[in-house]
């Protein structure tokens, strides 16, 4: 059998958000379309999700959450720079704005991250296979440093670096979505240093900013992976991660992280991703392109002709995305 051109981890985010979401994620995993999940420990269905992960031996990491719902750490007991007046996190953009303004106390971020890592260990009986950030909070300035420190302290080696080659030229993305994707990429580039200094590792490439929700299709996923493979030497195998959000739509009031489910979770877009990921079209295209699905644990040892995921392999993917 010829060596694959790419070994791809397909990660389903937001595991534990609601039972219907989790049902779809498990369905995708059992179909071989998803190879890893990221668990929200403050999600409405966290405990049942952890049971599903154990039952089906699903590789599970932490989806560190600093932007949606209620905290699990000391912040839940009183005033915190992480929370609004109602005791909830500040929201996707609210948290970013607070970080940019210098209003977020980074030691409080560290406390919450450690609490979530501890909660994960209690739920699963082990450390996460990896940790990434809900709404990419883990690469924000300052936050990336304490995130890396916490992961190193808890023995977590793998993270996500959300740098997607060519995302700035993806004209199908609405202007706000494209601007957000490019902002995430700028933060991710700056996070390389802190992540490397604390021994964190990640796949050579990342895809998912351009293929989220309604924008996912077999053609776009394979196109994004093709951009990653451009210029790859013959006989060399790259590693990559595809971020995905499959599942069945949430039905209010069930779901969420303490505030109920958000609009995206209740929309048809989650089901759309599930159908794209599990359809024969995408699987056939990936096989034709020499892409082999795997879990992060499968990348833990170097094979002939490929690199162990780490910072030095990233250099070809660090060029800026153009708006």
Swiss-Prot record:
A GO molecular function held by the record: deacetylase activity
Enzyme Commission number: 3.5.1.-
SUPFAM superfamilies linked: Glycoside hydrolase/deacetylase
Keywords: Carbohydrate metabolism, Hydrolase, Magnesium, Metal-binding
Class in the EC hierarchy, top level: hydrolase
Record's keyword annotation contains Translocase: no
GO BP annotations, alphabetical order: carbohydrate metabolic process
Named cofactor requirement(s): Mg(2+)
Enzyme active site: 13
Taxonomic superkingdom: Eukaryota
Pfam families on file: YdjC (PF04794)
UniProt-annotated binding residues for Mg(2+): 14, 134
InterPro entries, per the entry: Glyco_hydro/deAcase_b/a-brl, YdjC-like
Function: Probably catalyzes the deacetylation of acetylated carbohydrates an important step in the degradation of oligosaccharides.
Record family assignment: Belongs to the YdjC deacetylase family.
Protein name stated in the entry: Carbohydrate deacetylase
Organism in which the protein naturally occurs: Homo sapiens
